[in-house]
């Protein structure tokens, strides 16, 4: 393929499809992490393209913390029904039984038990040897130094000093029993690339990415949306109704919105052209301790 004849988005698309097909051919039991966000939606679209007109040859996995936005769960179920892919939803049963939540136990403990430990449970239960994720290198500094094929040991931990060289398009997927690879086909995309591709390909996304008047509270420098009656208000907090949208989606008590009037894809792209901060600025789990994301990844987080 003549790379000079492709736009940069088509080059990114071709690279991602190549990686997805490579994993499907090389591994015995791959799975695709489906977090329902914009990156997952793009990755799902690329995967459908990679195997069209056939069905996706591996399942999608959503590790549900029980604290996702209601719109996310509605979108997840509707998307699975529309495209007919095999969707596995896993919740950490011990965490649910213990009533782990972000209000009483804090973001770090909640994330570790409900997301990291929940993910490791699911990977062990189904014996997956490769897991796709939608992380991009431009999101956060620990993700910037991670390979496309990210090696994980039998405990699913990541050692940034023990990574394999990746020369051009040659990926090393050789693993021993119990080991696995996390695969990031969107590594070289930027947030702006994602939004431009969503616009060009007419990809459906969760409505929370578009600005609307929503109930929010000011907390720890973020606008937290009041998504259901489990939201615990602190002393002095008052619910306000503001025009906001989300650049990133996660557990609703830990995800900050931004004030915005952008309710179309073209308006979002215009915002991205002048944005000076990462979308991860709105994720409390990235800032709950020093080196937070790298520490979580070392422990098995995506």
UniProtKB/Swiss-Prot annotation:
HAMAP family (alphabetical): Sulf_adenylyltr_sub2
Could you state one GO biological process linked to this protein? hydrogen sulfide biosynthetic process
Annotated region Disordered: the residues are 280-302
Q: Which reaction does it catalyse?
A: sulfate + ATP + H(+) = adenosine 5'-phosphosulfate + diphosphate
What metabolic or biological pathway is this protein involved in? Sulfur metabolism; hydrogen sulfide biosynthesis; sulfite from sulfate: step 1/3
Alphabetically list the UniProt keywords: ATP-binding, Nucleotide-binding, Nucleotidyltransferase, Transferase
**What gene, per UniProt, encodes this protein?**
cysD
Per its record, how is this protein called by name? Sulfate adenylyltransferase subunit 2
Q: What is its EC number?
A: 2.7.7.4
Please, which domain of life does this record's source organism belong to?
Bacteria
Statement: the UniProt record of this protein carries the keyword Nucleotidyltransferase: yes
Q: How does it assemble?
A: Heterodimer composed of CysD, the smaller subunit, and CysN.
Question: Could you say which protein family the record assigns here?
Answer: Belongs to the PAPS reductase family. CysD subfamily.
Query: Which NCBIfam families has this protein been placed in?
Result: CysD (TIGR02039), PRK05253.1 (NF003587), PRK12563.1 (NF009214)
What EC class is this?
transferase
Task: Summarize the protein's role.
Answer: With CysN forms the ATP sulfurylase (ATPS) that catalyzes the adenylation of sulfate producing adenosine 5'-phosphosulfate (APS) and diphosphate, the first enzymatic step in sulfur assimilation pathway. APS synthesis involves the formation of a high-energy phosphoric-sulfuric acid anhydride bond driven by GTP hydrolysis by CysN coupled to ATP hydrolysis by CysD.
Q: Which Pfam families match?
A: PAPS_reduct
List the InterPro entries.
PAPS_reduct_dom, Rossmann-like_a/b/a_fold, SO4_adenylTrfase_ssu, Sulfate_adenylyltrnsfr_sub2
User: Any keyword Nucleotide-binding?
Assistant: yes
Which PANTHER family does UniProt cross-reference here?
SULFATE ADENYLYLTRANSFERASE SUBUNIT 2 (PTHR43196:SF1)
Q: Which GO terms describe its molecular function?
A: ATP binding; sulfate adenylyltransferase (ATP) activity
